[in-house]
Each structure stands twice: as C-alpha cells, then as structure tokens.
Amino acid sequence: MKLTPMMQQYLEVKEKCKDCILFFRLGDFYEMFFEDAETASKELELVLTGRDCGLSKRAPMCGIPYHSASNYINRLVSKGYKIAICEQLEDPSAAKGIVKRDIVKIVTPGTYSDSNFLNETKNNYIMSLYIEDKSVAMCFCDISTGDFFATSHSLDKSIILDEISKFDPSELLLNKDIDKNILKEIKNRFTISITNLEKDYFKDYNLLEGQFSDFSKEEYSLVLIKCGNGLLKYILETQKMSLGHIDCFKNYNIVDYLSMDINSRRNLEITETIRDKSRKGSLLWVLDKCSTAMGARLIRNWVEQPLINKEKIDKRLNAVEELVLNISLHEDLKDALKDIYDIQRIVGKISSKNVNAKELLSLKNSIEKLPYIKDILSKLEADLFKDMLSNLDELKDIYELLESSIMDNPPITIKDGNLIKNGFNKEIDELRMAKSHGKEWIANLESSEREFTGIKSLKVGYNKVFGYFIEVTKSNISSVPEGRYVRKQTLSNCERYITPELKEMEDKILGAEEKLISLEYEVFVSIRNSIEKDIDRMKISANIVAILDCLSSLSTVALENNYSKPKILEGNDIIIKDGRHPVVEKMIPTGSFVANDTTMDTEDNQMLLITGPNMAGKSTYMRQVALITIMAQIGSFVPAKEASISLCDKIFTRIGASDDLSAGKSTFMVEMWEVSNILKNATSKSLIILDEVGRGTSTFDGLSIAWAVIEYICNNKNLRSKTLFATHYHELIQLENKIKGVKNYSVSVKEMDKDIVFLRKIIEGGADQSYGIEVAKLAGLPEDVIIRAKEILNSIEQNKDNKIELDDIKENKNHIEKENKKEIATDKLLANDDFQISFTQIEEENLIKEISSIDILNLNPMEGFNKLYDLINKAKSIEKK
C-alpha cells in the first residue's frame, strides 16, 4: 500500500524535525500524527483518533484549533518539548494539487518568546556551553529582550555550575563529547532541557560578526567564538528569521562580580527559598518593589551579580540616597513608571514581526511617559541620573506616528481590520465610507420592507455562508408578497430570502470590507517596519527606564524598612552596628527582631567563633552578615543603624546537612567536599560562613576537622578570609588564646526557673553549654525522655575523665609555615591518654610508617582531611584489638 500524498508530505516535513512535535496545519487546525499524536494526546489531554493514510492501519491523530495554539504550545514547552510549526504557504483554494507546507518556526524552551506566557519578572535564557582545550565558554541569550552575552574561563566544573545557577536557563546547548561527569552533575542539580549537538555545529561560521556590528574576532578567544556561533546558529535555525533586536554582544568577566557558588546561593536564599522554591522569603522578594517588568528582571540580575567595583557601587548608592531624601520627586517617578509597559519585549516582538496593534498602543502609552521622566531626571544631581538624562531619548517621532495611526481600542488580531485611525490613510477612509454607506442602505432596506409587507419582525441578516438575506418567521410567511423575494434557505422557524438589489449591494459592501481589511493590514505592516528601524533607540530608553525602576525600588525598600546607607571600603573590615536579617525581620511582627553588631577584619577579628544552643539564632546572624554584604555591593541601603563594608570578592557558605545519594555521597562526604571547595577557592577578600563543620561524623573526628579548618583559614597567609564559624564543639573556644584572629562569641540565653529563653543577642565570649536538653524540651519530646537525658548527662559530667580538654591537645607549630605554601597539616594530634584520638598509644610499626611516609607537600585540603580521617579510623581499629 502507498501513503497518501498529504501523508507523504507530512513525513517529509517530519524528517526535518525528528526531535520535535510537529504541528501540521490542515485548514483551521494543527494536526499531529503517529508518535507525535500519541505524545500530544497524553500531555494535552486530547482525544486520540485516527486518519486514513494509505496504509493498512489508520494513522494515530489528534488536533487543536490554530487560533488557540498558543496555550497548547505553552503547555508542551513548559514540559520540555520542542514544537515545529508547519504552515500552509499558499491559499488552498488557489493551490494546484497538494497545498505547499513547510516549517516556519521551531519553539523550544529556550527560544520561547510568547510574552503572554513568559514570567515577566525573569529572563528566559537559552545557554550554550562549549569546552575545548581545558577552556570553557558560556553564552546566554534571551530572545524576548535581545540580551546576548558570553564569558570564558579555564575549565572548572564549579564555575559552570555557578553560572547555570545564576542565570537559570530554560535550555542548554552543548557539544556531545562533553565530559560525562560534568553532564551528570548538571542533570543532577538542574531541571533543564538539554540539546546535544555535534562539535562541528560550533565551528566558526562568522555568524557573530554578521549579527553584531561591533563584534571583532580578534578580541575574543576561539572557544568563546565557537560557543557564541553555536548559540546564534541554533537561534536563527529555530526562528527562521533575522532578529534585529539581538544587536549587542556583551562579554562579561566572572571576576568583575561578587562570586557566590551554587551552595551559597541556595543557603542564603538569594532568589528563592530552600524549603519550597518560593520567591517569597528570598532576598529578591525583599528588594524587588519595581513598577515595571523590565525593572523586575534587571533587579534580579543585580541581586544575582553584586558589584565589586567601588566607584560603580557608590554611584548606585548615591542615586538611591537622593531618591530617599527627595520623597516628592521619588513619588512622581513611581507614578510615571507604573504606567510603562514591557518595552523590551514589545521591541522583541516588533523585530520578530509578531507584534499586534494593542502592543503598539502599549508602546505608545509607555513612550508618552518619557518626557515626564526626563523632567524628573533634570531635577536630580547624582552622577547616575545625569548620565541617564543625557542618554534618554523621548522617542517623540515614534509617539507621534503611533498616536496618529493606531486605533485607541484595536483588536488583538491584525487581520480583522479596525486597526488604523480615520485621517491617517485616504484610501482607508474612502473604503470605510463605502462600507458605512452600504450598511446604511441595508438598514434602510429593512425599514422599508417592514413597512411595505407589514411584517414588523422582518429583518435583514448576514452570515459568512449565504451573505446578506431577508428573514421572515414561519407565522408571517403568508404576508410575503408573491414574487417579491427569491427563497434562499428554509429553517425550522423561518424562511430566508434574497433580492437582486440586495445581492448587488452585498458585493459592494463585502468588496469594500475585504479591501479595507487588506489595506489596513498593509498599512499596519508599514508602520511596524518604520518603527523597527529605531529599535536601538527604543532599547536604550527601555534600559534607562529599567535602571531607574531598580533605583526607585531600592529607595522604596530603604524607606519602608528603615535601612541606612552603607559605607564602601577598600580594606578588609566589616563593621555593622545593629544589623538585622532583611528577610526574617519582615516575616515576624514589626520591631521584634533583635539587632546585633558585627566587627570583622583580617587581623584580630578574622574568625568569629560562635557557640550557643540550636534555635538561638546563630545561623540567622551569620546569614544576615552575608546578606548585608551582598546588599551593600548591589548598591542597596542595608538593614542596620550603620555599616562599613569592605569589598568582598567571594562569599562561601557551608550550612546544614545534605546527602547526595544519587552520586553515592553521604552527608559527611558532601560536607567535606564543600569545605574543600571553600578552602581551595577563598581569598583574603572573601567572606566564609561555616555552620557546624564536622557534625556529620563522630564527635572526636568532627572536633579534629573543625579545629584543623580553623587553623588552616587563620594561619594560611594566602587565605585569612573573614569567617563566621558556628559550632557545638565548645572545646574550640580555647582557640581564641591559641590562634591569632579567633574571637569567641555566643548567643545569650536567659534561664528562668527550669526553662530557657533565647535572647537572640550575640555577645563576646564563648558558651559553656549547649542547652540541648532544654531545646529538646521546647521541641516537645516526651517528659520521660527529657528526665532520662538529664540523668545521663549528670552521670557523664560527674566522670571528669570523659571530658576532653583542648589545652591537652598540643598545637603543632611546624605546619604553619607549610600551610603558607598551600599544604595541609597531618602532623600528630596529641591528646589525653583516655581518648581515641591519642596518637601516643599507636605503637604498630606499619601505621607509624604510613604516617611518616605522607607527602604533605602534595596534599590538597580535601586529601588532607581524607587522610586524617583514614588514619583515625585505623588507630581506632588497633586500639580495639
């Protein structure tokens, strides 16, 4: 048997898009066949039917109306599918043989640009990742706005994960021969649509130079050029058109921004909460009070990429301060901003020929506000505002064109007429007049025929099948004069008639209407094309509006929450007076948050060692220091009475327990990997947050590791990062007298009767107990358990031999010099004879030989910890024997 011609055509088109669901246009429907139909019927909950295709079995089929396709496309794209749109390329009534059809667009998660369904507060990025010769390049594009930027770096898996985490792309393009471990890590950590491409796909095709007038290959590495070319090629192939709004190539350097690895972003809840991935409860939720979608997207970018350039930060802070101090001007600015639509995405639609008349009307109404904004800018003095004033284009010519041409309430579709105002085009006015006169003639005909026949219910109607007709109900048919009308249609309750004069007028009316709709569409396209020439001007003004909106948002937040302007320093100090957690204070009753001071530097206050019970507020305090630092480097006021913040290059956090079972890693192993990453990558300009390091293993192992980490951070002159270290190992408080830079702090607790009250105040000095049983009581453990726990604790405390004293653990002086050469100390830890970590009890020659043979010059921090852990376990095993 042979396939039908239509089905042959379908399979030929399908061959071009094997990885897509093909929407095949047949009349007023998009039809899907075979496997595509089965998939779509399941995902879209459509009825699966069949169609004769020339084979013995009917082809599985389902379909959707073409006019409602957007909703179905969105549902499929959100589930990670790609959709190929195949349209009819000629009028079926004029076609000779089978209608010509072909793919006009491929919609993928990363190239989806329908603003009706996109999150207006977040960019929809597609990302390409290209690795070659121990270098990696990453390129990002948001088709809806035209943003296109890239970076390159020496190959580092953590850098790749950090950038994916930062920009959260919907789709990732990568070369098929990418390292399997990197690919596995990406799949484990992110929900992202991945498209594998042959390495040749990324070859240098000179596409970037063709797309971006300011791009020069000589300025960039080959790996970056290939990465960018691959992304641009994919975009052009899927969109099937030139995209003029993608006209600016930006190369960014990762080290130009405050770096936060994937764990830090998660732990600090920068854009979403850990618990339920909600925006509410994140730092972004606090800072985003933007009036426009453009501002909301930009402030998200600011939050994801805090600055490390003092001049740029101070410019933002000075602008925010001026708005805070000029409340009247600030309110005027907010009033103007709230009426501005998403100019960036409207411009994207203009470029891709998808804009409708309502969106052009929104563009006009937005442009109308630009003179007001320019007037406000002229009254402001901050350098950032002066820069904006000189660059803001009021776009008056575009406003005048749209004001004179587009109807005030046009339809959504652009092929149904009623788009163009009277007076803009003479021919349109004449056709409207003809159409109007024709309909007036119809109305007069209805009136005269009622009078002539005496049938008061007689009416002149219209439908697309029969055109105009005279309708008479069954009860009045006897009153119709003989020979006056020609019967056209009989219905159950009426008869429909025509006359030669009515048909003649119908031709005139419909002819005028058809010409009018066609001409209005032509004029609309002409207006759109005229505006498209000024895309650059519109993008510049839109970007200025977005920046203004961000500054306005930060000013609003500062005023609403009683924030202060931080002082940005070049040194290493962090000094915060009455600091507060920006998120927590908004989630509890106003005024109930307990503020705390912070003093940190790289000398006497480098390592703040914080002890105290669970639930007392240690983690909140440490996070607030990190968040205040981030806010300051964004250019935001901060939740504190005063704050002086030295520029920070990186923020690291190691907070909470997290298994990575899919990778076969335990909680403790994950913890050690994270600590290792911190020690390898932190610098003297970094801020480190460490919460309960070492708790994932036995007490003495954990204590040993925590102690070694503190020594390493404080004694390594190439590190010496400012660090907040929370611990339950109270023995560590004695390190304040042993290691320069360690400073003890604790969370104050008040004992009342037999209960405790957390005062949430950070005070100098270490805590001497954890109040663990009291916390357990607060958590609701049974009374019997609490009583028994106290009995056991009393018994343990009475046995003094079971209490470890850190003074008994001799600090090894020799390793400090070695650590300044990036080594890990694995020298013997000497302790009380009653404990398992006592190396003096180890007499077996083979273990001694193993220890003496360790080449510490070639151990990194992680290997050092692992080796120490292994030696301790062997020592325990020998002791048991």
Curated annotation (Swiss-Prot):
Biological process (GO), any one: mismatch repair
PROSITE patterns per the UniProt record, alphabetical: DNA_MISMATCH_REPAIR_2
Pfam families, A to Z: MutS_I, MutS_II, MutS_III, MutS_IV, MutS_V
Amino-acid positions noted as binding ATP in the UniProt annotation, renumbered to this chain: G612, P613, N614, M615, A616, G617, K618, S619
Cellular component annotations (GO), alphabetically ordered: cytosol
Key word Lipoprotein present: no
Keywords: ATP-binding, DNA damage, DNA repair, DNA-binding, Nucleotide-binding
DNA damage is among the record's keywords: yes
Gene Ontology MF: a single term: ATP-dependent DNA damage sensor activity
Protein's job: This protein is involved in the repair of mismatches in DNA. It is possible that it carries out the mismatch recognition step. This protein has a weak ATPase activity.
Matches recorded under HAMAP family: MutS
Family: Belongs to the DNA mismatch repair MutS family.
NCBIfam families recorded: mutS1 (TIGR01070), PRK05399.1 (NF003810)
UniProt-recorded name of the protein: DNA mismatch repair protein MutS
UniProt organism field: Clostridium tetani (strain Massachusetts / E88)
Gene: mutS
